[in-house]
């Protein structure tokens, strides 16, 4: 039987933005889509618009010394699969991308549940990920920054605010209380890969599906853990407008360029 992640990997949308020279470092931006772990309407193509906006910025700015590419990553959805398949698919496909495209520096952009998966990819250290240790070591030594757009970070807090959201959580998890680890349990500034990680948290005032409660939760957690972060709260549109907003695109790429130039 073929590895199902092979198929998912070949569905990955690739946006090659700049190519400076063979000896340049390769900087990759990987987008992880949302959709509450269940929605087939959200795909790796969600970020095509923002890729175009980022491309415009790159064309007008100095990226000498870097090849820059963008990738939209895919993962299997519930109810066909349950946790931890979503995150292990993301790990597998990210690892393949890094190896196949020789990515030296990586930034992750996650929207909604994609932000959840991005945070897990970069920081989660639960026992169920032990067999992915070698892949995670490479991934985490390559990631320099996380852009978390209107994300979900605590299922317990989410269900307190939106009890009806159990309709999709129950499809994604057999028992979320046992299976979903709150980031307060694993975010630790003393871990080397977190020391070197830049956090960019973005949220829209106009988000009709998530209030600021999730963002506030993560912000307060990072403060308590003394982990530095950047926060942008503005009118970036409704929930599914955020990942196509041109101001968000500029925020992402200008922050990346400021780190490499």
Swiss-Prot record:
Signal peptide (UniProt feature, chain positions): none
Keyword annotations of the record: Hydrolase, Tryptophan catabolism
Active site per UniProt: 112, 207, 239
One Pfam family per UniProt: BD-FAE
HAMAP family: KFase (MF_03014)
Function per UniProt: Catalyzes the hydrolysis of N-formyl-L-kynurenine to L-kynurenine, the second step in the kynurenine pathway of tryptophan degradation. Kynurenine may be further oxidized to nicotinic acid, NAD(H) and NADP(H). Required for elimination of toxic metabolites.
Name used for this protein in its record: Kynurenine formamidase
Source organism: Vanderwaltozyma polyspora (strain ATCC 22028 / DSM 70294 / BCRC 21397 / CBS 2163 / NBRC 10782 / NRRL Y-8283 / UCD 57-17) (Kluyveromyces polysporus)
Encoding gene (name): BNA7
């Amino acid at each position: 039987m073929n590895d199902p992640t092979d198929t998912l990997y070949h569905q990955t949308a690739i946006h090659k933005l700049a190519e400076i020279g063979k000896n340049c470092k390769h900087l990759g931006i990987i987008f992880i889509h949302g959709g509450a772990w269940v929605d087939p309407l959200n795909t790796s193509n969600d970020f095509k618009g923002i890729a175009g906006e980022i491309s415009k910025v790159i064309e007008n700015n100095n990226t000498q010394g870097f090849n820059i590419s963008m990738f939209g990553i895919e993962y299997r959805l519930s109810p066909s699969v349950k946790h931890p398949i979503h995150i292990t698919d993301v790990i597998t496909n990210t690892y393949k991308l890094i190896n196949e495209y020789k990515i030296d520096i990586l930034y992750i952009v996650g929207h909604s549940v994609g932000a959840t998966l991005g945070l897990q990819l970069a920081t989660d250290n639960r026992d169920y990920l032990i067999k992915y240790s070698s892949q995670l070591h490479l991934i985490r030594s390559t990631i320099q920054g996380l852009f978390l757009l209107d994300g979900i970070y605590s299922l317990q807090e989410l269900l307190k605010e939106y009890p009806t959201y159990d309709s999709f959580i129950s499809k994604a998890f057999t028992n979320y209380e046992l299976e979903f680890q709150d980031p307060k349990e694993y975010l630790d500034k003393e871990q080397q890969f977190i020391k070197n990680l830049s956090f960019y948290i973005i949220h829209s005032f106009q988000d009709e599906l998530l209030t600021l409660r999730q963002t506030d939760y993560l912000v307060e957690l990072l403060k308590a853990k003394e982990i530095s972060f950047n926060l942008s709260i503005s009118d970036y549109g409704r929930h599914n407008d955020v990942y196509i907003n041109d101001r968000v695109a500029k925020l992402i790429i200008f922050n990346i360029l400021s780190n490499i130039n």
